[in-house]
């Protein structure tokens, strides 16, 4: 089996992509990032539980500078994350995206992961992108992955490549796939906040609720 590493936030997409990936690759490391996001503690904690479930070691990458230069509500303590938005409204979803956008976040994550992958002799980086959010988050899109993979052919000697087994799926399809794969869906954290429980009203929580069929 080819070696791979996984970028894991403990959300639905990355967890299910990992569940699929372990059937195809030898996953040797999980990377979780702390860039000052409000859910960082929960993402790290739940990612560790998911990685432990699969017997994969975790490394937490600290990126404090990203919080310093980012002004959006995902990290800024003086800004409220949008809640209760209408997921069927393109305008509302676009506004929500702009309020939680972190500059080049996925680009940074992937390039850091590529350095780890090459050093570990791994050819693949497993990520959790999806078709639903790619409509507003351009760094979830197939075009983004294709562009990054083109660049990685030049920046890594072993031509590390990004793969996402959820890339072409809507959230509801990803949830069903997770059930089929026996993914530890009880361990996921899909909330923008870091409270004791998921808030249930931020965009990420609303998408998870809809994916579950309203439950």
Curated annotation (Swiss-Prot):
Gene3D superfamilies: HUPs. Pathway: Purine metabolism; 7-cyano-7-deazaguanine biosynthesis. One of its GO terms (molecular function) is zinc ion binding. It is an enzyme of class 6 (ligase). This is 7-cyano-7-deazaguanine synthase. Binds 1 zinc ion per subunit. Catalyzes the ATP-dependent conversion of 7-carboxy-7-deazaguanine (CDG) to 7-cyano-7-deazaguanine (preQ(0)). SUPFAM superfamilies: Adenine nucleotide alpha hydrolases-like. Its cofactor is Zn(2+). It comes from the Bacteria. It comes from Carboxydothermus hydrogenoformans (strain ATCC BAA-161 / DSM 6008 / Z-2901). Homodimer. Zn(2+) binds at residues 191, 199, 202, 205. InterPro entries: QueC, Rossmann-like_a/b/a_fold. Its EC number is 6.3.4.20. CDD domains: QueC-like. The gene is queC. PANTHER family: 7-CYANO-7-DEAZAGUANINE SYNTHASE. One of its GO terms (biological process) is queuosine biosynthetic process.
């Amino acid at each position: 089996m080819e070696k791979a590493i996984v970028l894991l936030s403990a959300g639905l997409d990355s967890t299910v992509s990992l569940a699929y990936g372990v059937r195809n690759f030898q996953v040797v490391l999980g990377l979780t990032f702390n860039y000052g996001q409000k859910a960082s503690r929960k993402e790290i904690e739940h990612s560790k539980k998911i990685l432990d479930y699969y017997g994969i070691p975790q490394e937490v990458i600290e990126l404090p500078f990203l919080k310093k230069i980012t002004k959006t509500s995902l990290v800024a303590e003086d800004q409220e994350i949008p809640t209760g938005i209408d997921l069927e409204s393109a305008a509302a979803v676009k506004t929500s995206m702009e309020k939680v956008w972190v500059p080049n976040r996925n680009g940074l994550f992937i390039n850091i992961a590529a350095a780890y992958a090459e050093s570990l002799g791994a050819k693949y980086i497993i990520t959790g992108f999806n078709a639903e959010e790619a409509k507003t988050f351009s760094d979830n899109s197939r075009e983004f992955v294709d562009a990054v993979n083109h660049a990685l052919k030049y920046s890594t000697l072993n031509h590390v490549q990004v793969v996402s087994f959820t890339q072409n799926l809507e959230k509801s399809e990803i949830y069903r796939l997770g059930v089929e794969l026996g993914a530890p869906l009880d361990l996921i954290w899909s909330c923008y906040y870091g409270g004791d429980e998921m808030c249930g009203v931020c965009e990420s929580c609303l998408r998870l609720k809809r994916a579950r069929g309203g439950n």
